[in-house]
Amino acid sequence: MHLLVLGANGLLGSNAVQAGLEKGWTVSGTYHSTAPDFDIPLFELDIIDSSTTSEIIEAVDPDWVVNCAAMTDVDGCEEHPDRAHDVNAQAPGEIAAYCNQAECEFLHVSTDYVFDGKSTASYSENDSVNPVQVYGQSKLDGERAVQEVMPEALVTRLSFVYGVHRGTDELAGFPKWVRDQLVADNEVPLFTDQHITPSRAGHTASTLLELIEAGASGTYNVACRSCVSPYEFGAAICDRMGAAKSLLEDGSQSDIERPATRPAHTCLDVTKTEDKLGRRQPTLTADLEAISGWFDSEPKPNDR
């Protein structure tokens, strides 16, 4: 199996590279500006550069292209909607078309923010979509662009990605911020009126490759089984660190002004993924246990 990971220097992309290498697959990757520290063929690429993208796919001749490249800054997308559309919507459709021409398969990574968050139940792949900000709309447009030219493509929706960056071996995302605040003895304001199903990058990347091996196509939710608020997520990190929860402060999304609206409840139902793979997705507690070494003063590099 030959995998081409677009966005190999991102959190998810670096884990996809690592997961592929651990399976003994041939892996190539692209990066936007800074090359990751992997001993694989790497190509500098801005995915809105359609001609270069096409040339790389033709040169690499992969079995699968995995698109982890995206504009994920939610507020940045709101402030720069044209760039968000180019990266998150137009480019994925073009990549899918190139994959058709090259006769390779395509996995596109999307988001829980395609939903409006008005439901109190976890969203399945078949629930109605209704993004409430530019980021979610651009990602939904990307899903549709991909599926229009390649109906058999694999589209995966993730939620609140965090974990260990495999190019730098450093903790990244929400847990890093909470950990650093707790270590500095700072108060940590966390929302209680937002609910998500966090996606640990390491397990998520492995799940994406399992779906590839299982011959999956269509849309799949890939997240943990725990629907939690950021406050509850922070409390779980405190438990993992053995830190006092007294530093955590109840907060509301209305407490701060941001350019983009965030949906209140975008927990993902992962039943379809579990049924396809014949196993359960992890809980948040299990996912944090898997990277417990990065909450210590001296990380354990072999933790996954």
Language-model segments: what does each one mean?
Residues 130-154:
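Active-site Tyr-X1-5-Lys
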Residues 90-134:
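Conserved Rossmann-fold NAD(P)-dependent oxidoreductase catalytic core, especially the SDR/UDP-sugar
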Residues 1-23:
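N-terminal Rossmann NAD(P)H-binding glycine-rich loop of SDR-like oxidoreductase domains
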